[in-house]
């Protein structure tokens, strides 16, 4: 009997040693394999490991968070890491958070790390297999097919539409002189109209239809955050029972019906004209995005669902992200009178009649472009992007288990004081050519980087230049909102809880 009793402590000791050994390789309470260094050195020498609120890793750290508290939690985690990249351990998978451009470079440049992470799976019902989410052959073939739709000559053909929409926008501003103008209300219709008429080739005349689309987009984003902040919500069955599933379906139906009507309208126009035509010099004409997709459909390279996915992706990315940047840029111009004055002096050199301003002249607005870039640095429209290890992969000298989630924190990378001294100050001069010479090539990545960078970034910059030049030339911007009054929120794009407001006064010429 006493021999049996003596054996119990020995058995417990053996089990303890066994568990310790297993725990070096596996985070048992998170049911996931641990990250380890390739050379066997301590993991803490390469990455900070964020302690969780419980013994179950970081699984319960963001439970029932709001978009605002998610934003603050990520900023606090970055501050605790003290300039290091850091690890979270969630159920079934670690998450590697990259906040330094040096390590982000390897992720961006990797040919293995092109699969988006699990958060994007929650967006799939909205965007399908569009460029943002698709991978492998589908992504490569679609990217190759769509690249010509953003060629210089195509962008040049959009200039007239941008100018026309700007005139309508200026008329809206004229009606709001000396009043507080809510930028969140007036900017999105402008960018949505531009997307529909340029890239999609359909004029959006029914503004109420556009308003319904924008409201549905915001509702979809709220559901996304609800699911991100509750690990159980990642499971569709749980979301169906306890989440806003039916409301989500209704909003998906609104946005998909909206894009489908646009596609059908364009398909009818497309069938009435001869594609493959040549211009007066005998060169094959280039077409905007939806024309390109319809031509590919006619050649059997893409089906109707594929067109819907790409249109939904580009409408969302092109309208919402550009709106966000324009809103923050106008706010920063209102808050910094000296910067606004320099921009005004630059745009004053443009021809009197906006119809006479060429693409070349817009490209010469160097300081205005610096202002746009600095706004994007401080307030990136997309504050983070995600990747996933589809197999065990070595990243930055660490062995990442299969299914490791990688989050590249664009917001924090572009506020790294080593590359942007006094990062919380608005200083457009950072982007003057002479000040960018020695900067790390991946320190400024508002449009992502590497092979999965944003296909429409030149489109966005031109669109913003045209609008900002027109506004600055005709109106003086005065602040009605202060930065310290804003509560930032993490979503698919960066948002604030409060509407951002400015005041306008007419410039006397």
Swiss-Prot record:
Keywords linked to the UniProt accession: Endoplasmic reticulum, Heme, Iron, Membrane, Metal-binding, Microsome, Monooxygenase, Oxidoreductase
Record-linked InterPro entries: Cyt_P450 (IPR001128), Cyt_P450_CS (IPR017972), Cyt_P450_E_grp-I (IPR002401), Cyt_P450_sf (IPR036396), Cytochrome_P450_Monoox (IPR050196)
EC number: 1.14.-.-
Cofactor requirement: heme
Membrane topology type: Peripheral membrane protein
Source species, domain of life: Eukaryota
Subcellular location: Endoplasmic reticulum membrane; Microsome membrane
Molecular functions (GO terms): heme binding; iron ion binding; monooxygenase activity; oxidoreductase activity, acting on paired donors, with incorporation or reduction of molecular oxygen
UniProt-annotated binding residues for heme: 317, 454
A GO term from the CC aspect: endoplasmic reticulum membrane
EC top class, as a word: oxidoreductase
Family, per entry: Belongs to the cytochrome P450 family.
Free-text function comment from the UniProt entry: May be involved in the metabolism of insect hormones and in the breakdown of synthetic insecticides.
Name of the protein: Probable cytochrome P450 4ac1
Species of origin: Drosophila melanogaster
Taxonomic lineage: Eukaryota, Metazoa, Ecdysozoa, Arthropoda, Hexapoda
Gene name per UniProt: Cyp4ac1
């Amino acid at each position: 009997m006493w021999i049996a009793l003596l054996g119990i402590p020995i058995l417990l000791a053996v089990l303890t040693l066994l568990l310790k050994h297993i725990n070096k390789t596996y985070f048992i309470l998170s049911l996931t394999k641990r990250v380890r260094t390739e050379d066997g050195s301590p993991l803490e020498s390469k990455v900070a490991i964020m302690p969780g609120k419980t013994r179950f890793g970081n699984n319960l750290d963001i439970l029932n968070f709001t978009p605002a508290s998610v934003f603050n939690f990520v900023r606090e985690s970055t501050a605790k890491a003290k300039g290091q990249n850091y690890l979270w351990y969630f159920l079934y998978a670690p998450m590697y958070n990259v906040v330094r451009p040096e390590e982000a470079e390897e992720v961006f440049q990797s040919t293995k790390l092109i699969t988006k992470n699990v958060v994007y799976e929650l967006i799939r019902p909205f965007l399908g297999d569009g460029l943002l989410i698709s991978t492998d052959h589908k992504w490569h073939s679609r990217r190759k097919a769509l690249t010509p739709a953003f060629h210089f000559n195509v962008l040049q053909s959009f200039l007239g539409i941008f100018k026309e929409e700007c005139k309508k926008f200026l008329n809206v501003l004229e009606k709001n002189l000396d009043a507080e103008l809510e930028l969140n209300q007036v900017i999105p219709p402008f960018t949505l109209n531009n997307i529909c008429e340029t890239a999609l080739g359909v004029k959006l005349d029914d503004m109420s239809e556009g308003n319904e689309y924008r409201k549905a987009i915001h509702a979809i984003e709220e559901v996304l955050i609800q699911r991100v902040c509750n690990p159980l919500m990642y499971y569709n069955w749980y979301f169906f029972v306890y989440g806003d599933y039916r409301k989500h379906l209704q909003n998906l139906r609104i946005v998909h019906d909206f894009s489908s009507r646009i596609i059908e309208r364009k398909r009818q126009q497309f069938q009435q004209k001869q594609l493959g035509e040549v211009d007066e010099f005998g060169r094959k004409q280039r077409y905007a995005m939806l024309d390109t997709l319809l031509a590919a459909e006619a050649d059997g390279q893409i089906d109707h669902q594929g067109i819907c996915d790409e249109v939904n992706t580009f409408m969302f990315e092109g309208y919402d992200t550009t709106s966000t940047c324009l809103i923050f840029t106008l706010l920063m111009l209102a808050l910094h009178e000296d910067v606004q004055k320099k921009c005004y002096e630059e745009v004053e050199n443009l021809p009197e009649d906006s119809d006479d301003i060429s693409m070349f002249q817009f490209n010469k607005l160097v300081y205005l472009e610096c202002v746009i870039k600095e706004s994007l640095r401080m307030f990136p429209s997309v504050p983070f992007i995600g990747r996933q290890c589809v197999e065990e992969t070595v990243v930055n000298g660490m062995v990442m288990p299969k299914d490791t989630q990688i989050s590249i924190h664009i917001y924090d990378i572009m506020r790294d004081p080593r590359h942007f001294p006094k990062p919380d100050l608005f200083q457009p001069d950072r982007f003057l050519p002479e000040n960018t010479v020695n900067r790390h090539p991946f320190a400024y990545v508002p449009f992502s980087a590497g092979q999965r960078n944003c296909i429409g970034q030149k489109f966005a910059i031109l669109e913003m230049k045209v609008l900002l030049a027109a506004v600055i030339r005709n109106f003086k911007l005065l602040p009605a909102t202060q930065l310290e009054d804003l509560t930032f929120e993490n979503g698919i794009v960066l948002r604030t809880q409060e509407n951002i407001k400015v005041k306008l006064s007419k410039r006397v010429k």
